[in-house]
Amino acid sequence: MTSDFRMVFDARDELLASARECEAEVFLRAFGNTRAQLDEEYGPYEDSSVFLVLADQTDMVHAMVRLIAPGGPAGLKTLVDIGGAPWGVDGSRAASAVGIDMTSTWEVATLGVRRGSSAHGTRLSLALYHGLLTGARVNAASSFVAILDDRVRHLLGSVGILTRALPGTASAPYLGSGSSTPVYAHFAPLVENQRKNYPEAYRLVTLGIGLDGVAVPAPDEFKVRERVGQHLDSARDWSDLSVGRIPVA
């Protein structure tokens, strides 16, 4: 089967440049964030950033997720940012209160699909979610944190990617979004709940069954290349969950 798009985890070189262009286009349109503002916000996390992308046959990126891996010198942006306005919450204490292991918790920092990809928008969004969950499993992530625009949070919840607000936080304006919430989720119970209560989404988003037109790489290609000074724990796994091998669409 011919694929319109291919998925790449930890994009580099030309794909990385195209991913940044996609990120800038989406965030300017949705929230009014300029490229300079994005550079200022995410620059401290650059060495820890990992891009998951969906590219066409010309290597133009149509959809992307910027992840922040654990162990970087700047920490996780969500836990840093909730310490300031409008929340004023100690990120370390909030994380500790809900059992977040900082050595294996990742951040979903940005996520977007180009407007010109609207004909494939839903498919690309679902493929991004699949790549996110696959990358988390392969890299032994225990949890994730994010500050999600409430519309995006609702879309994730509709496919069983359910999140909770970090303690002491609530929906508030953030970086051009009129309503965003600092959230977290523990991956293993999230996937188990999805399997039980969102079985169709579990097959599509977690197992990747039915992602037609998107070439998904083998699981070992989701292994992130370790960054200097970071410890990515490969000892953990989700072996108690029937996630199975990820098929190629």
Language model features: what each stretch is:
Residues 1-40, 50-61:
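Short amphipathic alpha-helix that is part of the acyltransferase structural core
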Residues 37-43, 168-173:
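Short, solvent-exposed loop/turn elements at beta->coil junctions and helix N-caps
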Residues 40-46, 151-155:
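Beta-rich nucleic-acid/ligand-interaction surfaces
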Residues 44-53, 73-75:
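A short helix-loop-beta-strand connector motif used in the catalytic cores of GNAT acetyltransferases and
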Residues 56-96:
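Short, His- and charge-rich active-site/binding loops that engage polyanionic ligands
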Residues 80-189:
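Acyl-donor binding region in acyl/amide transferases
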Residues 163-227:
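Accessory, usually C-terminal, subdomains that scaffold auxiliary metal cofactors
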Residues 238-249:
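C-terminal non-catalytic accessory extensions
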